[in-house]
Regions:
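Extended catalytic cores of very large enzyme megasubunits
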Residues: 1-320
Length: 320
């Protein structure tokens, strides 16, 4: 699946985000205050008791490392001592996904930085929205393919959250370079927003010099979106996108045929809902709303805009 959305209202979401990003799925996530307030209070592990944790060299293994580290700071127990010896060295060939292995270093840096955020907290305290945001960005920093970062994120936050609004102000790229991994957007509920509230955010956008935060208008603050903000998604839901090259399309029949093929492929993909690693809510939502989008690339290179795009869209829906 191309994209997903998850509010960070459960400690297990951190591991799920790692799992999704490693599989190539872009993730929208919410650190709105009413979501992060649902996370448990911090209960640090016992530093005098350590337990070796051997990380399996797989998508699930890397995600588990994040999951169990997070769990150890919410529910106590032994302090984890990670063993990276099973992870393939940098440059090793990846047979299934293709490309070359990044080696253990990106994951090691991720876990050290995530634990750095968690270890600064006191027992009984809670993670703030910006701390949750930074943890997700550190997770995204570990997602590499052939040395190239491949994680796509959008972070939705409460419009009155001053720390998130200022998260890309000043020399943030020196102090918090991980924040480059995500677009940050303030959630604005259409029927509640006042003009003064909007322009308060807008002044911060101008002052940041970074073009952020973005402003995400919604009718329901519990719904989110994908990293490109193309589609509304309920919590723990996927969307599936396919794309057709229309640069050499010259007739309506050609356009309809490609749209039909793309719709068929996307519909077929939408049936693969045994996610095994994710909680059942993901499968339930995906089966309930099997969302599909068909996009076009190469539009300026051909006469496709002279054709009937509504007719092509109709063929997509009929095939789906």
């Amino acid at each position: 699946f191309n994209c997903a959305y998850a509010p960070v209202d459960d400690w297990r979401v951190f591991g799920e985000i790692m799992f999704l990003l490693l599989g190539g799925t872009g993730v929208g996530y919410s650190v709105q205050q009413h979501h992060v307030d649902e996370l448990p209070e911090i209960r640090k592990p016992n530093a005098n008791r350590t337990r070796r944790y051997l990380i399996n060299d797989s998508i699930e293994g890397w995600a588990d490392a994040v999951k169990y580290l997070i769990r150890s700071y919410f529910f106590g127990g032994s302090k984890l001592r990670f063993d990276y010896s099973d992870i393939r060295p940098k440059g090793a060939r990846l047979v299934t996904s293709g490309g070359k292995a990044p080696g253990p270093q990106p994951l090691k840096e991720c876990l050290v930085k995530v634990e750095g955020v968690l270890s600064e907290k006191e027992d009984g305290s809670r993670l703030s929205a910006i701390e949750v945001h930074d943890i997700v960005c550190h997770i995204a920093d570990a997602v590499l393919a052939g040395g190239i970062r491949r994680a796509a994120l959008i972070s939705l936050f409460s419009a009155d959250d001053k720390e998130m609004i200022a998260s890309k102000s000043g020399s943030w790229w020196e102090k918090n370079p991980q924040r480059a991994r995500a677009n940050n957007s303030a959630v604005v509920v259409r029927h509640r927003v006042k003009e003064s509230d909007f322009f308060d955010i807008w002044e911060n956008v101008k002052a940041s010099g970074a073009g952020e935060p973005g402003i995400y208008f919604t009718n329901d603050q519990d719904w989110g979106t994908n990293p490109c903000a193309e589609i509304a998604l309920r919590p723990f839901q996927f969307c599936n996108l396919t794309e057709i090259n229309v640069s050499d399309v010259t007739t309506q029949e050609e356009l309809n045929a490609r749209a039909t093929a793309a719709s068929f492929i996307g519909t077929l993909q939408a049936t693969y809902v045994d996610f095994h690693y994710l909680r059942p809510i993901w499968q339930y939502n995906t089966e309930k709303d099997a969302l599909l989008g068909v996009s076009m690339t190469g539009i300026p290179s051909g006469p496709v805009l002279q054709l009937d795009l509504r007719e092509a869209a109709k063929t997509v829906k009929e095939e789906n």
